[in-house]
Regions:
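Short, conserved micro-motifs composed of acidic
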Residues: 1-212
Length: 212
């Protein structure tokens, strides 16, 4: 995720062993890939346009479990990201977490209160530039296929009901990785729409009636 007025900051997820903050924290490997779980990193450009060494985000965000797919509020002080814990006694599921930045440091991530249960998977958050809606992926009951795209209105520190983006966006396949460019333009990946094979990138535009 590129960020900054000059797009000179890049936030990304990686399984690399960190060299900076958090390197001594307890770690676990993914039960799916067997690799080290993903953490979030930041890399910046210097005044000459060269990328500096990546730095791991604070332990308040990165844990021994998976973190990924960050999205930022317009002022850059709120980060939404995917958090996926491993529970030996139950299914592996993903949730959306929120972290606030103060004095150039990210605070402890907290669960976004979008669903009441702990079974429905949520992930790949993308906050609209105007801050009104959070777009995300879910396997919630009543969708059109495997994983669908949803959105929820941001109401202060809470969220309104989940809204499925409908059959023009969602298919019997999987739709994932939404990115809202300007509050009316949505980019996403899908293996259900006709394409080149597997996940392809698609674009949709919101019309004046609120329909994609």
């Amino acid at each position: 995720m590129l960020y900054g007025e000059k797009y000179d900051q890049l936030y990304f997820a990686s399984t690399r062993t960190p060299k900076g903050a958090g390197k001594d924290k307890e770690e676990t490997n993914s039960a799916i890939t067997g690799q080290r779980n993903n953490d979030l990193f930041l890399v910046k450009q210097d005044e000459n346009g060269a990328w500096l060494a990546p730095v791991e985000l604070e332990d308040e965000v990165n844990t021994e479990f998976d973190e990924g797919t960050p999205s930022f509020s317009k002022d850059g002080n709120t980060m939404y990201y995917t958090y996926c814990a491993q529970d030996p006694e139950g299914p592996r599921t993903s949730e959306i977490y929120i972290s606030s930045r103060s004095s150039a440091k990210w605070g402890k991530g907290t669960r976004a209160n979008i669903v009441k249960d702990s079974v429905t998977a949520l992930g790949h958050p993308s906050i609209s530039p105007d801050g009104k809606y959070l777009y995300f992926v879910s396997d919630a009951v009543g969708g059109y296929g495997g994983k669908d795209l949803f959105r929820a209105r941001v109401v202060g520190s809470d969220f309104g009901p989940m809204e499925n983006l409908g059959p023009d966006i969602n298919t019997p396949g999987d739709e994932m990785f939404p990115y809202v460019r300007d509050s009316v333009t949505l980019y996403f990946a899908s293996d259900g729409h006709p394409g080149m094979g597997g996940l392809d990138i698609f674009k949709a535009t919101l019309d004046s009636t609120g329909k994609w």
